[in-house]
UniProtKB/Swiss-Prot annotation:
Family: Belongs to the ClpX chaperone family. HslU subfamily.
One GO-annotated biological process of the protein: protein unfolding
Protein name (Swiss-Prot/TrEMBL): ATP-dependent protease ATPase subunit HslU
Presence of keyword Translocase: no
Annotated organism of origin: Bordetella bronchiseptica (strain ATCC BAA-588 / NCTC 13252 / RB50)
Length: 444
């Protein structure tokens, strides 16, 4: 089910499968997504006046800001882009300008819409691919116009069709005409000239379009290539572009990470002009403007912007007032406790424990984590965070990697064994490293 049709409670329940705690942030993004659906039910002209309420997430690193955005993207099945605010420079300076955010979002939407359309016409494309392969195996008689006249009463053709569907002639080589793939042009351009590079790539790709070449390949490979070619023929490019642009305008989500890095403190100098310039350039995008892309004009009035930052050295109030006003919903994310680490390791759907168990299971090594082992692992990770840099849940990656380092290296030698990871095993592998502040700082 698409998140656009889910209630806020259902969206939060889905996010709970992957993210521990942070209920305020989950509720905020769930309501924002549900408001998308609500707006679509409102009649015009009022619908056009209802704008999304952008969200600012504030919290230390590793507490789930990016993960909430990543999971939301999968759940929403909408055009989504995550970008670092620090990658952009003020218009007029060397570097990328903020309009490329919308261009990249539109590119993603085009790709997403094309995949959807290709799936829709796939069954017809497969039928056409079958016929073209059978034409190569059993050439049909040609009519007065020179076109092949396919008749299903041909017993040889029917026999080959049956064998083709059963996969019995997959390794048979046939000679067939297929469209040449578009050349991959690598156009080197200075920063900020990405649009020109895209136009040049499109021009060179257009030169090779519709050119066909006779190739001798196996039936299995030919079928895949012809299905793609036939599906592309059945997709109307103009309709696809219009649908993709509408999808961006009505359902697009932009996640602006590290926005605190472009917030200038009053007492600092130097790069402040450029930072404030990026903020000023973001203003029209967030408020609503029209951006020119290679597929047409895109309005940003109803695109949802979610910004996030740790705000260690700066405060949200250090953003220019106009930009502060464009993010009316602010949610603070909590620092993670040792108990949260236990839940992250044991309760999430794709926990690190499940990942490592599956990875080593491919070499017939069975890992069994006990409750006291999980708790000890969480306590050590939390302790290292407290004594060194606090990187939140990301500390679990480094601790888990160190814990299973020897086991991963010698996995093939331990094939068929059951390894129990309890508190004693965790202490044996990690206690010395975690206990020494110097070692913990550089190893964990």
């Amino acid at each position: 089910m698409s998140a656009n049709h889910m209630t806020p409670g259902e969206i939060v329940s889905e996010l709970d499968k992957f993210i521990i705690g942070q209920n305020r942030a989950k509720r905020a993004v769930a309501v924002a997504l549900r408001n998308r659906w609500r707006r679509q039910q409102v009649a015009e002209p009022l619908r056009h006046e209802i704008h999304p309420k952008n969200i600012l997430m504030i919290g230390p690193t590793g507490v789930g800001k990016t993960e909430i955005a990543r999971r939301l993207a999968k759940l929403a099945n909408a055009p989504f882009i995550k970008i670092e605010a620090t990658k952009f420079t003020e218009v007029g300076y060397v570097g990328r300008d903020v309009d490329t955010i919308i261009r990249d979002l539109t590119e993603y939407s085009i790709k997403q819409t094309r995949e959807l359309e290709m799936r829709r016409v796939r069954s017809h494309a497969e039928d056409a691919a079958e016929d073209r392969i059978l034409d190569a195996l059993v050439p049909p008689p040609r009519g007065a116009s020179g076109e092949p006249e396919r008749g299903e009463d041909n017993s040889a053709r029917q026999t080959f069709r049956k064998r083709l569907r059963e996969g019995k002639i997959d390794d048979l080589e046939i000679e067939i005409e297929i469209a040449q793939p578009m050349p991959q042009m690598d156009v080197m351009t200075p920063p900020g000239m990405e649009e020109m590079a895209e136009q040049l790539r499109g021009m060179f790709a257009g030169l090779a379009r519709d050119k066909k070449k006779s190739k001798k390949i196996k039936v299995r490979e030919a079928f895949k290539l012809i299905v793609e070619e036939e599906a592309a023929k059945r997709v109307n490019e103009d309709d696809l572009r219009a649908a993709a642009i509408t999808n961006v305008e009505q359902n697009g989500i932009v996640f602006l990470d590290e926005i605190d890095k472009i917030a200038a403190r009053q007492e600092t100098g130097g790069a402040d002009v450029s930072r404030q310039g990026v903020q000023r350039d973001l203003l029209p995008l967030v408020e609503g403007t029209t951006v020119n892309t290679r597929y047409g004009m895109v309005r940003t009035d109803h695109i949802l912007f979610i910004a996030s930052g740790a705000f260690h050295l700066a405060r949200p109030s250090d953003l220019i007032p106009e930009l502060q006003g464009r993010f009316p919903i602010r949610v603070e994310l909590d620092s993670l406790s040792a108990e949260d680490f236990v839940n992250i390791l044991s309760e999430t759907d794709a926990s690190l424990i499940k990942q490592y168990t599956a990875l080593l299971g491919t070499e017939d090594v069975k890992l069994e984590f006990t409750d006291d082992g999980i708790r000890r692992l969480a306590e050590l990770a939390f302790s290292v965070n407290e004594r060194t840099e606090n990187i939140g849940a990301r500390r679990l990656y480094t601790v888990m990697e160190k814990l299973l380092e020897e086991l991963s290296f010698d996995a093939s030698a331990n094939s068929g064994e059951v390894i129990t990871i309890d508190a004693a095993y965790v202490d044996l592998q990690l206690a010395e490293t975690a206990g020494s502040q110097d070692l913990a700082r550089y190893v964990l």
